[in-house]
Amino acid sequence: AGGDSNPIIHFDHVHKIYDLGEVQVHALRGISVDIRRGEFVAIMGASGSGKSTFMNIVGCLDRPTRGRYLLEGIDVASLSKQELAQIRNRKIGFVFQVFNLLSRTTALENTELPTVYAGLRGQERHQRAQEALKRVGLEGREHHYPSQLSGGQQQRVAIARALVNEPSIILADEPTGNLDSHTAVEIMEIFQRLNEQHGITIVLVTHEHDIAAFARRIVIFRDGKIRRDGPNQERLLAQHVLPTLPTLDDEEEEPM
């Protein structure tokens, strides 16, 4: 796209070294990679490959030891802790394997939480949260508590919460790890829709090849380096896969 030639995520020879007493662990060894606005990228690799460290740096939860990380053109190393927290809240939506919902709080209130930190007023908070829940197919469930929702529905609330501040990027770390295969594909259908219809950049960490298959691009880490990076030639469309899968009763869509 013409005006979007600058990458949203830019890693320039990024190293990350952890000092564990007398031992130094080289988690990232000179990573250079660009992710452009509107991409849907799966990050793969074995445990200890560097993929989690990469995600932590992308999400401004950690900083490079050497090298540069630019997020939307901003050099993250130059930011204060407070500025980093603001960026995490406004520019990045996080989705994890564990849903991290507040149990005594409704789906709507859980979704609203990031807007409270962003300083939005009540009415706008409600509107944004309702819109986000609608996008993930949870209209009519706004006042349900997490205990009244299935695992897949709870993960949808977590995605709505990640969307509510209209972030530039969604970072999803093993988001289907706790879900059965049918529900996992439903979640991937939401990510594909958000990516295609709303242009949201999605970076997804997974160790499952059948989940990475829904991304447009796959980056494979090994020993702190990128071993493979390229378009996903055999990309699956979740809406085509869903009808072929058996459903579990509690995950079936309600009759219209």
Predicted regions and their residues:
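ABC family nucleotide-binding domain
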Residues: 7-221, 226
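Conserved beta-strand-loop-alpha-helix hinge in the C-terminal portion
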Residues: 225-253
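Pre-NBD coupling/linker segments of ABC/ABC-like ATPases
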Residues: 1-3
